[in-house]
Amino acid sequence: TNVYNFIKDSLNDNESIRFLNTDFVNQWRNAHNIAKSDPLDAQTISTIIGTDSDVQYVNDNVFENKNGYQDLKALVHRHYQIKKIYSQEINRLIAQCDCLFPELQYVFEPKSAAFIAVLSSYPTTHDIINASRLEVFNIVYKATKHRCSMDKIDKLFELCHDTLVPDNISSYGRSIILDLVENIKTIKGQLKMIERYIRDVASLNPAYKLLLSITGCGPLTAATVIAETGDIKRFKNADCFVSYSGTSPRNKRSGTSVETLGKISKKGSRYLRHAIYMIAEFARRHNPVLKHQFERIKNGNKKRHKLANIAIANKIARYIYSIMKNKSSFVILHEHIMRLPEETRYAFFNSISLDFPKNTRKQIYQYSDINGEVHKFVYTKLEETMII
């Protein structure tokens, strides 16, 4: 996949390519009880094209590199692939530390700069015991950009002196940790480079800055939405876009009976669905309108948590469609705020600030007042939720 545009560019004048709708092919294969394999798929596609007059094709504009969509898509997919490798290496490192340096996780958060910096110089508990406190402090102090106190170093040494890890650790265990640390550093460098490329390409699209106005939508998430959506005009309405994002509910109907499962269809782009879900995770905590909707649907029932999340993701997908279609930024409307309970309104206005520097690194959002005037604000009190 993702190479059709290159094939298309290499065609002669008398040649053309048509793209089959994969859902249509899957449904046709299932209806004829044909197994799934590459040879059988080729035979199935050949049979469909030759015999079925109702065959469904995809608009070939989807695969054109117009406005850099395909370049951005390739970068986003590569970022997801490397991020997955990064998570795997981190998990392997934590597993090794559980055996050779368990005390470190009680002082520094795994994946943190301090955690990696300590392991790069002192891969085991006994390396710390034999080290200088001031030397360890200087390493951590530099890695955390001067945000570390000596108290944490003292706590680390105190825990290490009471360790249960034997002192006869083989050199292989130490070398595995050092190798994992080096791999993680390399992967982080690759991620930063790709993120820079993604921002450069995505910023050329006018929808990029508009999407950043959605509560919880960061630079990488906005770039993913643009890459996976392409030209918003190819969707007839918001329902079509929601269906493509895979956030639409999956219901079963038989006559007048409707079975509501509270699950999503998971059709379309999984990258787009993940991006929308990440936006929804932040928005349900900090956007007052969506927060109230989430709490109303959940109604204190833990079993309805996922159902409420799906509802918020569905709402976010509709916001995205409206923003990209109308080329307008997202604004929390005054009339929507005034419908909320007083406690929710108070919590919202108590967590934002209208006074912030022009060069702030925080995400800037908007809400309207009773006169329709739009005000920009930043959040000052946030839970530990990342905007990516």
Enumerate the language-model features and the residues they cover.
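Helix-hairpin-helix/helix-loop-helix acidic hairpins
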Residues: 160-220, 284-291
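Generic structural signal for well-ordered, non-transmembrane alpha-helical segments
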Residues: 80-83, 87, 182-192, 314
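Amphipathic, charged-and-aliphatic alpha-helical interface segments
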Residues: 109-122, 184, 188-198, 220-232, ...
